[in-house]
A protein has these predicted regions:
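Class I SAM-dependent methyltransferase SAM-binding "motif I" and its flanking Rossmann-like core
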Residues: 149-194
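N-terminal glycine-/serine-/threonine-rich phosphate-binding loop
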Residues: 26-64
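Glycine-rich N-terminal segment of FAD-binding domains in flavoprotein oxidoreductases
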Residues: 57-80
């Protein structure tokens, strides 16, 4: 695994998104219901591997953004049994807590462990820079024009990425990466709605009874929850029976 460093002094090489890109209630979600969290992890891994092979065959690389939470790490464990072109894979973070390196709260800590020796390029969010606003702008400069795949989770409160109810970051339309207010004790760096709209495909992994209500709202296109405002070219929801 190659973890790429980042200087906070970079400038975005891509145009700022327009507000029109940021919000959307017409998103159609395909739902796949599976037996349990293990089945969700296995199906998610197979889907990621298939998308990776297709992207590399078509364009020579696979640009994949990964959220935190519990579901992605089980999926990554299942990826060990899949054929993935890791040497042509670039992994980005959807969100990250502002915490010291190797802190167990860091999504990067879990991502690094999950990848093991897989030779993917990892572009971590620079949450240890002294100027986090400049660091967020620098990370935005690294983002591709399109993500081949973005993984998202769904919180019981309807949040996704670190786009949480009531946070001012929900209204950001002119930046691809932004900082949140403290949530569960941590400030977060997160991709914004315009950044998520760059996804050619979104994969939602949703498990547990406490996700029933937010999942129903997501599938209904309910924009009163943050997850319901995500817009992308295509969306697949893999949920276990407890959530669905």
């Amino acid at each position: 695994m190659w973890v790429e460093g980042l200087s906070a002094g970079g400038q975005s090489l891509v145009p700022n998104p327009s507000p029109k890109q940021a919000l959307g209630s017409e998103m159609h979600h395909e739902l796949q219901t599976l037996a349990d969290p293990g089945a969700v992890a296995r199906a998610g891994a197979a889907f990621v591997a298939d998308r990776a092979r297709a992207a590399v065959a078509a364009n020579g690389s696979f640009h994949f953004a990964v959220s935190g939470g519990h579901t992605p790490w089980a999926m990554f464990a299942e990826l060990a049994s899949e054929t993935v072109p890791w040497d042509a894979t670039v992994i980005y973070q959807v969100d990250e807590r502002v915490a010291p390196p190797d802190d167990p709260d860091r999504n990067l800590t879990h991502l690094t462990k999950a990848l093991g020796s897989a030779p993917a390029q990892v572009r971590p969010m620079p949450v240890n820079e002294s100027d986090l606003v400049a660091a967020a702008a620098s990370y935005a400069a690294l983002l591709p024009e399109h993500f081949d795949l973005v993984h998202l989770g769904l919180g019981p409160d309807g949040h996704t990425a670190s786009l949480v109810p009531g946070d001012p970051v929900l209204s950001v339309t002119d930046r691809l990466v932004a900082l949140t207010q403290p949530y569960q004790g941590r400030v977060r760096m997160t991709l914004t709605y315009p950044a998520l709209a760059r996804a050619r495909q979104i994969l939602w992994l949703v498990t547990g009874e406490d996700k029933q209500e937010p999942l129903a709202k997501l599938l209904a296109g309910d924009t009163t929850i943050p997850a319901g405002r995500v817009e992308a070219a295509a969306s697949l929801v893999m949920a276990d029976r407890a959530a669905a």
